[in-house]
């Protein structure tokens, strides 16, 4: 029996990057998961898939969604946003909320983040990637539109 391919949509607009080229070993060495990164250019971050928000960092810069089939998806906004301690990021949901792909999760104050010289490279990761097969990321250097373009796919 063939397992249907699961797809994750772009949680933000911007240009895609290969995870291996992200200038932070936590991400480039896949210590927190496998996927890709997007250099954020939009002020809204959406859910890339259906599921439950299973984790929301206190500093608001990252959240995880657990899908119905147990896959953990992490959206990490920027590389050094943790130093902002939540400033410039407004959560629109909280841990435990059921969300659908495309639901707005965070609102970003891009002018403030840019003024503070925050690196907006934003990893989109499958944390428990060893539980999925055929993980495929869109090619690097592609402009993607928030909520429109599929950026990662896998089978369970």
What are the language-model segments listed below?
Residues 1-156:
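Contiguous, well-folded functional domains in the mature portion of proteins
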């Amino acid at each position: 029996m063939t397992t249907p391919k699961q797809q994750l949509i772009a949680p933000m607009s911007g240009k895609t990057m290969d995870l291996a080229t992200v200038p932070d070993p936590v991400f480039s060495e896949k210590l927190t998961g496998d996927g890709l990164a997007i250099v954020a250019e939009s002020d809204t971050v959406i859910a890339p898939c259906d599921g439950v928000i299973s984790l929301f960092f206190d500093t608001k810069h990252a959240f995880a969604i657990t899908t119905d089939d147990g896959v953990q998806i992490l959206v990490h906004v920027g590389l050094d946003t943790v130093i902002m301690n939540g400033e410039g990021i407004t959560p629109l949901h909280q841990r435990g909320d059921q969300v659908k792909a495309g639901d707005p999760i965070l609102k970003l104050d891009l002018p403030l983040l840019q003024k503070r010289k925050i690196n907006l490279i934003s990893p989109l990761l499958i944390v428990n990637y060893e539980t999925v097969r055929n993980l495929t990321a869109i090619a690097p250097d592609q402009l993607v539109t928030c909520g429109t373009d599929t950026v990662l796919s896998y089978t369970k």
